[in-house]
Every structure is written in structure tokens, then in C-alpha cells.
A protein has these predicted regions:
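Alpha-helix boundary/N-cap detector
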Residues: 128-136, 295, 311, 327
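Residues at alpha-helix boundaries and the short loops/turns that link adjacent helices
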Residues: 109, 164, 294-295, 307-311
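Generic structural signal for hydrophobic core residues of well-folded globular domains
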Residues: 6, 63, 78, 118, ...
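P-loop NTPase signaling cores
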Residues: 1-200, 204-205, 209-212, 226-240
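Post-HExxH zinc-binding segment in Zn-dependent metallohydrolases
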Residues: 36, 296-306
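C-terminal leucine-rich, beta-strand-based interaction scaffolds used for sensing/assembly
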Residues: 219-300, 313, 317-342
Length: 343
């Protein structure tokens, strides 16, 4: 959100790069965005070194240690450049020339104000609206931000309630008269959507089949949902009570209307991806090991910390710690351990 605000209001030339696009190098990632003479490496290097362009690199936590090292080396080499990088909490060594800023959790009043600000975007037929909705928000925050609970759990609650995506889900659920479970938000939202899916389409939500298709989609680095096969699913996910996906419409070269659906946030996609990792089948157990170093499935392991049976989660914790020791990459293991403690 901050980067979006920064880019929209900048008066300078800005290059936005997802960190995943920098696996070959930052200069190479910029070149891929340009055409003609502007692609010249020497020309680009002069622009960057002189501070003529700003560079935003987003999502360092979503890439391998090798890619992060390339980005850090670039930043240290162009120390006069205007470069901003973002990451979720991560154990790493920033470039020696970098200045670090930490986003602080929202205060209770700020969380309350955000929830109230969602009212105009809530479904028109929401069960709880107006003053009743405001009171529901107050009551809920008083309960979940109870200072009598363990500090670690309270810190985890504040982190979740400082995430606009999670807060929006909380607002939607409160407006429906539900009690959000902050540590299982996506699962809770899915259960509500699946129950309505069954009522509307007279059949169970095809969770296993849809999740397998999403896993394949992720492996192929595709973004659009396989809507040809799951049109009813896409329609239910897009319902304004859940807003789990968003759609984009356009006309093709023949003037025919086209429409595609995309997950509104990676956290929602991760919920469906994690279904492939759950259960006692050989396939599920194999994925737990095979995808451990795949940054595309980082969020899946965080969900596993809360969704796996406790003994299985503890076993996976040890495997992740061993993996981190072997690879010197603890981007997943540290957060997994913290999440597991909340249980």
C-alpha cells in the first residue's frame, strides 16, 4: 500500500520491480521493461548512479537467498542511487549502505477507524450496519486485544489486525454477524462461501479438484484462474460478501468480450494451495519436502503451522529448521516457529 501511494504521487521517473523479476539481476529486470536505446546497460547504469531515476524493489521475502544477494550487491554498488526495497519480517543482512524503516502495528483506535471506513464497501444486504456495525467492531476489538493474554499472542493479533487485507475480511465477517477467528481467517471465510455455494448450485464446493488446479496454475506461474473449468466457482468467489477474487474485462482483437478472474490476495490463493499439502497421503507428505525451498509456496508453510495436527506441525518445524541450517535460508522457518508458538 505504501509503495502504491509512493509511486502514484512521485514527481520523478520510477521503476517498480517485483523482487521475483530480479533473479537474473536488477539491471536485467529493468531492461526487460524497456525498448530500443533505453535498454543500453551503460545508459541505465549512468541514470541509476546519478540518481536520475528511482527504483522500488518489492517483496525481498518472496525470493531465494541467491536473488536477495544479487539485489543487495546491486544496491551496494549503486549507493548514490535512490532505491527503496520492501520485505516482510525477514532474517537477513541488509546492504551496508541501507537505512532501515520498520512499519509499526496499528493502534487500537486506528484499527477501529479502518474497520468503520469499510462500511461504504460492505454488501448492501449486510445483516449488521450503521451504529450496530460500529458497536460490533468495538466489542470485537475489546475482546481480541485483551491485554490479559500472553504478550506473544497479543503481538500476533496486532500484526494480523495491522494488515489491510485481513482487516477487510474481518469487516466483511462482522457485517455478516460472524465472529472472525484471526488465526484461521481464510478457512473461516471459505467455509461461509462454500456453504452458500452448496445452497446456490445444489452441489458441494469442489475443493479438492479446484485446489489441485490452483496448484498446477502456481507451478506454471499463471495468474488467471482456470475459469473455463470452474466458472461457478469463480462466480461464488467473486460474490461481494466474500470478494475472494476480482475480475477483469476487456475486448479482444475481434471485439469479443473477455473476462478473467484473479485472487484478490496471495493469502487467499495460499488457502487453496495448502489443501494439496494436507492429509496423510504420500503425495501430500512429498510436497511438504519438495516445496520447502520454493518461494512461491512460502505462505503455504505459514498456514501449515496452524492447520496441521500439532504433532505433525512440530515435526515439520524440525524439518524446516534443518533445511534452514543446511541452506542458510531461514526465511520460512523463523516465522513458522513463531506461528506455531501461538498454538
Amino acid at each position: 500500500m505504501f509503495l502504491r501511494h509512493l509511486l502514484q504521487n512521485s514527481q520523478r521517473i520510477v521503476v517498480y520491480l517485483p523482487a521475483q523479476k530480479c533473479h537474473k539481476g536488477v539491471i536485467e529486470a529493468i531492461q526487460d521493461k524497456l525498448h530500443g536505446q533505453a535498454q543500453d546497460a551503460g545508459f541505465l547504469k549512468n541514470l541509476i548512479y546519478s540518481g536520475a531515476i528511482d527504483i522500488c524493489i518489492d517483496g525481498l521475502n518472496e525470493v531465494t537467498a541467491e536473488t536477495r544477494a544479487k539485489i543487495c550487491q546491486f544496491v551496494e554498488s549503486y549507493f548514490r542511487g535512490n532505491i527503496i526495497m520492501t520485505t516482510q519480517p525477514l532474517e537477513w543482512t541488509p546492504p551496508s549502505t541501507a537505512k532501515t524503516y520498520y512499519l509499526q502495528p496499528l493502534e487500537k483506535q486506528q484499527i477501529q477507524e479502518f474497520l468503520i471506513s469499510r462500511q461504504p464497501r460492505l454488501p448492501k444486504e449486510a445483516k449488521i450496519q450503521g451504529a450496530d456495525y460500529a458497536q460490533a467492531c468495538t466489542n470485537y476489538l475489546t475482546e481480541v486485544l485483551n491485554h490479559q493474554q500472553a504478550k506473544e499472542e497479543l503481538d500476533a493479533v496486532r500484526r494480523i489486525l495491522s494488515n489491510p487485507m485481513d482487516l477487510t475480511v474481518v469487516a466483511l465477517m462482522l457485517s455478516q454477524g460472524k465472529h472472525p477467528n484471526l488465526f484461521r481467517l481464510q478457512e473461516q471465510q471459505y467455509n461461509l462461501m462454500a456453504a452458500e455455494y452448496q445452497q446456490e448450485w445444489k452441489q458441494e464446493f469442489p475443493l479438492k479438484r479446484f485446489s489441485a488446479a490452483i496448484y498446477q496454475m502456481r507451478l506454471e506461474d499463471k495468474q488467471a484462474l482456470p475459469a473455463d473449468e470452474f466458472h461457478q466457482v469463480a462466480m461464488s468467489l467473486e460474490d461481494e460478501k466474500y470478494k475472494m477474487v476480482v475480475s477483469r474485462q476487456w475486448q479482444d482483437e475481434k471485439g469479443e468480450a473477455k473476462k478473467e478472474w484473479y485472487f484478490r490476495h496471495d493469502k487467499i490463493m495460499d488457502f487453496f494451495l495448502v489443501q494439496n499439502f494436507l492429509g496423510e497421503t504420500d503425495a501430500a507428505e512429498g510436497l511438504l519436502v519438495d516445496r520447502m525451498g520454493d518461494t512461491r509456496f512460502r505462505g503455504v508453510y505459514f498456514l501449515l503451522a496452524t492447520l496441521l495436527p500439532l504433532d505433525a506441525a512440530k515435526e515439520l518445524r524440525e524439518d524446516l529448521i534443518q533445511y534452514a541450517a543446511d541452506t542458510k535460508d531461514n526465511t520460512v522457518s523463523n516465522t513458522f516457529v513463531q506461528l506455531l508458538r501461538t498454538r
